[in-house]
A protein has these predicted regions:
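Amphipathic alpha-helical interaction surfaces in cytosolic regulatory modules
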Residues: 22-100
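Acidic phosphotransfer microenvironment of two-component signaling modules
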Residues: 85, 107-108
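Short acidic-hydrophobic, aromatic-tinged amphipathic segments that line or gate anion-handling sites
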Residues: 101-105
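Short, charged, intrinsically disordered terminal tails
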Residues: 109-114
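STAS-typified acidic loop motif
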Residues: 4-33
Length: 114
């Protein structure tokens, strides 16, 4: 399934709803493009909703780290929401839970930006 990404505003935070596979090629490129567009629009508080991401490879993990770094370098914050079991396990295996703030509830995640 191809990656799809849409975004919406909630409580001053840009919530990016992502679905599909974040993999080498189109998937990681779309994520990179979406984050770049948000940063160009001065949107630096970003919550990535990964509830519908069914697969992520090492390239996808690299894009998440790159997105995090890019947002942080702009003085912003990027957090993760609704990890699937596969994505959760991969972040745990790669020890990226020490980098990302991860939430299972959108309301709590949005409050964390304040």
């Amino acid at each position: 399934m191809a990656l799809r990404a849409t975004y919406r505003e909630a409580a001053g935070v840009t919530v990016v709803d992502i679905g599909g596979r974040i993999t080498l090629g189109e998937g990681s490129a779309l994520l990179r493009k979406t984050i770049r567009e948000l940063l160009e629009d001065q949107r630096t508080l970003i919550l990535l909703n990964l509830a519908d991401v069914d697969y992520i490879d090492s390239s996808g993990i690299g894009e998440l780290v790159s997105a995090y770094t890019g947002v942080k370098n702009r003085g912003g914050s990027l957090k993760l929401l609704h990890l699937t079991r596969k994505v959760h396990d991969l972040l745990q295996l790669t020890k990226l839970f020490t980098v990302f703030e991860v939430y299972s509830d959108e309301t709590t995640a949005l409050r964390s930006f304040q």
